[in-house]
A protein has these predicted regions:
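A generic structural signal for short beta-strands and their flanking turns/coil linkers
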Residues: 33-35, 40, 70-72, 76, ...
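Short, well-ordered beta-strand micro-motif
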Residues: 14, 25, 97-99, 122-125
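N-terminal strand-loop-strand
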Residues: 1-38
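A generic structural micro-feature
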Residues: 4-5, 33-36, 86-92, 113-118
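Active-site-adjacent beta-strand/loop module that shapes the phosphate/pyrophosphate-binding cleft
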Residues: 78-109, 122, 144
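Residues that scaffold the ATP/ADP-binding catalytic core of kinase and kinase-like folds
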Residues: 24, 47, 132
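The catalytic Nudix box helix
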Residues: 39-73
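Nudix hydrolase/Nudix homology domain
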Residues: 31-35, 102-151
């Protein structure tokens, strides 16, 4: 079996004033039936810290520009292995929490890979997230959020 490609990533738990979290609907370009929901974020650029990467990804994927310091420290970290576009990855990722009043998501800064694998976004309530049968990541997302904020 092939060794996984090591990848560092940063993600943002973006929660609005209605206590909803923003998730993007993605799919594997090599298998479009492999669908999932995930938080804004992605791989770090060379030399980039997790907080810098989280702020950059947040702007690229939502149009929301913030200073990295606005994100504070990571609230969660995990390591996941997954296959995407026929490649096996081992991804270490830091999650940051950002609460905002509201936001009209702007995806015009998506890169080519995001345009090829993300087709929509949605603001989810915790009840909707807990009730859905659709896969989302991290799988502990509702528990994680409830442990961080009162929803």
């Amino acid at each position: 079996m092939a060794q996984p490609i090591a990848r560092l990533a940063a993600r943002v738990l973006l929660i609005d004033e209605a206590e909803r979290i923003l998730l993007f609907h993605g799919f594997d370009p090599a298998d479009p039936t492999d669908e999932f929901w995930l938080t804004p974020g992605g791989g770090l650029d060379p030399g980039e810290s997790p907080v810098q990467g989280a702020a950059r990804e947040l702007f690229e994927e939502t149009g929301l520009r913030i200073a990295p310091a606005d994100l504070g420290e990571p609230v969660f970290r995990n390591v996941v292995e997954f296959t995407f576009n026929t490649r096996l990855y081992r991804q270490e990722q830091d999650f940051f929490l950002l609460r905002i009043p509201s936001w009209d998501v702007d995806t015009t800064n998506f890169d080519e890979g995001e345009r090829a694998s993300v087709d929509r976004y949605r603001w989810w309530t915790m009840a909707e997230l807990e009730a859905t049968a659709e896969p989302y990541y991290p799988e502990s997302l509702p528990t994680l959020i409830r442990g961080l904020v009162e929803v």
